C-alpha cells in the first residue's frame, strides 16, 4: 500500500514545476506582477495580480504571448478570474488576482518574456527566470514608486 501511494504521489508531480514570485530582469509596469507560475505538460499558468487605485480599469489582451529565449512564442489560451480584451474595473481593495493559461513552455527554455503587444503602454516583463532557485540571486530592491516603497524581485531593475 505504501509503494502504491508513493508511486501515485510521484506521478502526480511529474512534469510540473511551480515558481512562487519568479525573478525577472525588466518590467515596464508597476501595477501588474506575476505572483506564481506553474509549468506543466498541458499549460503554463501565470497567476497575475494587479494592484492600483480602486475603480480604475485595466485590460489583458488576448494577443499576449510568452516569448522564450529561443524566439518561440507561446500563445495565451484562456483566462480565469478575468475577461480578456475587456475593461476590468478594480474593486474597492484596489487588487485583483487571476490566472492566464498559455501553451506549455518547452523544457529547454530558461527564461521567457511576458509580451502583451508592441505598443509602448503594453505590459512587458522581460527575462522571467523559469527556475525555482535562480543561480544569480540579487537582493530584493527597494523601489520608490508613487511615494510608496514597494519590494520587487527584479534582477537589475530600479
Descriptions of predicted regions:
Residues 17-40, 81-82, 142-143:
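Low-complexity, acidic Ser/Thr/Pro/Gly-rich terminal tails and inter-domain linkers that flank the onset
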Residues 33-43, 87-92:
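Short, solvent-exposed beta-strand/turn "edge" segments of beta-rich domains on protein surfaces
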Residues 42-52, 158:
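Short, well-ordered beta-strand segments enriched in hydrophobic/aromatic residues
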Residues 51-87, 91:
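The feature marks short-to-medium sequence segments in extracytoplasmic or secretory-pathway proteins
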Residues 77-111, 119:
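Short, solvent-exposed, Trp/other aromatic-anchored flexible loops in extracytoplasmic proteins
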Residues 122-158:
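Pro/Ala/Gly-rich low-complexity, hydrophilic intrinsically disordered segments
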Amino acid at each position: 500500500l505504501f509503494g502504491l501511494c508513493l508511486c501515485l504521489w510521484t506521478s502526480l508531480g511529474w512534469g510540473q514545476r511551480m515558481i512562487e514570485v519568479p525573478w525577472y530582469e525588466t518590467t515596464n509596469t508597476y501595477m501588474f506582477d506575476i505572483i506564481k507560475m506553474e509549468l506543466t505538460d498541458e499549460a503554463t499558468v501565470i497567476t497575475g495580480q494587479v494592484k492600483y487605485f480602486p475603480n480604475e480599469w485595466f485590460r489583458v489582451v488576448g494577443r499576449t504571448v510568452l516569448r522564450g529565449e529561443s524566439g518561440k512564442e507561446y500563445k495565451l489560451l484562456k483566462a480565469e478570474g478575468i475577461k480578456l480584451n475587456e475593461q476590468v474595473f478594480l474593486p474597492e481593495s484596489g487588487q485583483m488576482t487571476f490566472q492566464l493559461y498559455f501553451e506549455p513552455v518547452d523544457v529547454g527554455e530558461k527564461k521567457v518574456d511576458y509580451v502583451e503587444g508592441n505598443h509602448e503602454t503594453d505590459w512587458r516583463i522581460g527575462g522571467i527566470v523559469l527556475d525555482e532557485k535562480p543561480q544569480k540571486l540579487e537582493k530584493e530592491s527597494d523601489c520608490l514608486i508613487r511615494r510608496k516603497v514597494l519590494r520587487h524581485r527584479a534582477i537589475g531593475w530600479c
